Swiss-Prot record:
<feature type="zinc finger region">
    <location>
        <begin position="53"/>
        <end position="91"/>
    </location>
</feature>
<keyword id="KW-0863">Zinc-finger</keyword>
<keyword id="KW-1078">G1/S host cell cycle checkpoint dysregulation by virus</keyword>
<keyword id="KW-1121">Modulation of host cell cycle by virus</keyword>
<dbReference type="GO" id="GO:0030430">
    <property type="term" value="C:host cell cytoplasm"/>
</dbReference>
<dbReference type="GO" id="GO:0006351">
    <property type="term" value="P:DNA-templated transcription"/>
</dbReference>
<keyword id="KW-0010">Activator</keyword>
<keyword id="KW-1048">Host nucleus</keyword>
<keyword id="KW-1035">Host cytoplasm</keyword>
<dbReference type="GO" id="GO:0003700">
    <property type="term" value="F:DNA-binding transcription factor activity"/>
</dbReference>
<feature type="region of interest" description="E7 terminal domain">
    <location>
        <begin position="1"/>
        <end position="41"/>
    </location>
</feature>
<keyword id="KW-0922">Interferon antiviral system evasion</keyword>
<dbReference type="GO" id="GO:0019904">
    <property type="term" value="F:protein domain specific binding"/>
</dbReference>
<dbReference type="GO" id="GO:0042025">
    <property type="term" value="C:host cell nucleus"/>
</dbReference>
<keyword id="KW-0945">Host-virus interaction</keyword>
<keyword id="KW-1114">Inhibition of host interferon signaling pathway by virus</keyword>
<keyword id="KW-0862">Zinc</keyword>
Amino acid sequence: MHGNVATIEDIVLDLKPEPFDLYCREQLEDSDAEDETAVTQPDKQAFKVLSQCGGVCCKTVRLCVYSTHTGIRVLQELLHQDALQIVCPTCASRL
């Protein structure tokens, strides 16, 4: 810069594209193997199920299950359709 104030002519930009390697050296596992394990071993988790006793008392019955999301949906459908009823220990002893 020559003088007290910078002018456009005084500013020199040296912008040259700098090439760099876009390829990653990381090794990826075969994605087909991951897909097969996901299908054969679905993730299970714990669920708390609250339902009314299917016996005489109609008390609230709490059930803890370890299931997949698909399995818990099937259980939910069975309970809603009255195809399956959970019975409390007191009513179960009367059966």
